[in-house]
Amino acid sequence: MSKEKFVREKPHVNVGTIGHVDHGKTTLTAALTKVLSEKYGGEKKAFDQIDNAPEERARGITIATSHVEYQSDKRHYAHVDCPGHADYVKNMITGAAQMDGAILVVSAADGPMPQTREHIVLAKQVGVPNIVVYLNKADMVDDKELLELVEMEVRDLLNSYDFPGDETPIIVGSALKALEGDKSEVGEPSIIKLVETMDTYFPQPERAIDKPFLMPIEDVFSISGRGTVVTGRVERGIIKVGDEIEIVGIKDTTKTTCTGVEMFRKLLDEGQAGDNVGILLRGTKREEVERGQVLAKPGSITPHKKFEAEIYVLSKEEGGRHTPFLQGYRPQFYFRTTDVTGQLLSLPEGIEMVMPGDNVKVTVELIAPVAMDEGLRFAVREGGRTVGAGVVTKIIE
């Protein structure tokens, strides 16, 4: 049996490193690939391979990210590491690399620093469910009490942003030593301990297919003698012929029944997460449905106009605005498949204006309701040009 085949059978989890600049996130990423490839097979990546992160685009925004993979005894991990602080902010807000759990890297020599705090805040805002801590550069700290002090500081910081700081696992080690093949406690064993902790502390995420059905509507057709067909890509769950579904967003919510599912012009019994399908709706007129609405399992999602969000505003160099904007700013918010105009009702206290390149918490009111839940991503656009990205952090009404 080939090794590659074996990898696929383990459950898959997405993780990433977060933390202050130069605290060792990329070194730890390299150490994870080295130590685990030696133990479980797979490819090891050198520091500079990871550090030269390729650029990718998500929601019209360019982000530099490195993707590596490794496996533990129980799982297959896909791990994302970003070279610069701005890339982390953009990555977390756009959800370009969704994280089921984050590894917070803190230098034992420096303790928590401004970006440590900022990354914890962002992780909370964008819904990263769990954090484990790797207290790095422990080989540079001889004083056991100092280590304990840093550990307490990190726990307090996590607690202050509603993560369970007291229960959070903290692994003490040196990513550099592990990379050099050091077998002492802070070396390779700390990496094995970290991944074993991730295996137990990060719960297995619910698969998209097991969640309630949702499909954003991309197009609507009328087929004579058969009725109305809507097309799109199933985002989550399963749709079966005969299922009752709701049409949510833009207008009042209505109920209908799925009377047919087709893919590649073939009729199917069901469509599932990831499929591009056409869904035939019973008794629904073509003008009653439009792009921007969603089909969903009844009661699973509701339409809203007013919400809080964390947004990243593109800098001028990234093709964004050249000037700041104020409260009352009215761009379009692109949710899933359509633009909806909205207004910035409020900015954080003491912030008069938002500069290109900033990330900020805002309250938005849309002119039409959109099917949303917390964690939904969107783009901020002006006349079709992307000027920012955001994530819904709290629904107001």
From Swiss-Prot:
Name this polypeptide is given: Elongation factor Tu
This protein's GO CC annotations: cytoplasm
Family annotation (CDD domains): EF_Tu, EFTU_II, EFTU_III
GO MF annotation: an example: translation elongation factor activity
Residues the entry annotates as binding GTP: 19-26, 81-85, 136-139
Region of interest called G2, as start-end residue ranges on this chain: 60-64
InterPro entries per the UniProt record, alphabetical: EF-Tu_GTP-bd, EF-Tu_GTPase, EFTu-like_2, EFTU_2, G_TR_CS, P-loop_NTPase, Small_GTP-bd, T_Tr_GTP-bd_dom
Cross-referenced PROSITE patterns: G_TR_1, G_TR_2
Chief site of localization: cytoplasm
GO BP terms in the entry: translational elongation
EC assignment: 3.6.5.3
Ranges where the record places region G3: 81-84
Gene name of the encoded protein: tufA
tr-type G domain location: 10-206
Record region (G1): 19-26
Residues annotated to bind Mg(2+): 26
Keywords linked to the UniProt accession: Cytoplasm, Elongation factor, GTP-binding, Hydrolase, Magnesium, Metal-binding, Nucleotide-binding, Protein biosynthesis
Subunit structure: Monomer.
Region G5, annotated ranges: 174-176
Enzymatic reactions: GTP + H2O = GDP + phosphate + H(+)
Pfam families: GTP_EFTU, GTP_EFTU_D2, GTP_EFTU_D3
Family statement: Belongs to the TRAFAC class translation factor GTPase superfamily. Classic translation factor GTPase family. EF-Tu/EF-1A subfamily.
